[in-house]
Amino acid sequence: MNRRKRSLWKRPLIAGIAVSAVTILVLSVVLFVWPRTDTPREVDAIVVLGGGSGPIRLTKGLKLALDDYAPTLLISTPEHSTCRYSLPRVSVICFHPSPGTTQGEARYVGKLASERHWSQIIVVSGRAQTTRARLRFDRCYHGTALFDPAGPVKIQNVVYEWGALAKALTIQRDC
């Protein structure tokens, strides 16, 4: 009888763990591996976010600018770095966000966009970062932000993004 009582609670526990694992896996794929993206079109500015896949993002942002999607290219750069980009027909602005996070980038772009009366931008983010970046820009930028991610998704990016998204949804709820 004692053995049977032990097995009665094991099955629901195992089922609950399995359902939780599948739910987390599906949400990870939807939010971070294949996030909602947008098709680029002509906008006022292209914004390249900094971070781990920076060179891949930068290449994509430069290509979008050279393909005449926008007359202005904003590049988020680490503090103490220099901006040495010159493109024909494109104004290049390098900026150091404060804080040096996606939230800091969204704040800077939101302020600059307001000053320059930009109504549409393209944001080039890391693929895993796209969902959280969209949330941050929705809070700080009052125009239309299209997201065109670059770079592969690594498992450590997904783990990081779960924590960063939870923080953005619970602790840092403002711009």
Predicted regions: what they are:
Residues 32-163:
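A structural signal for short, hydrophobic/glycine-enriched beta-strand patches
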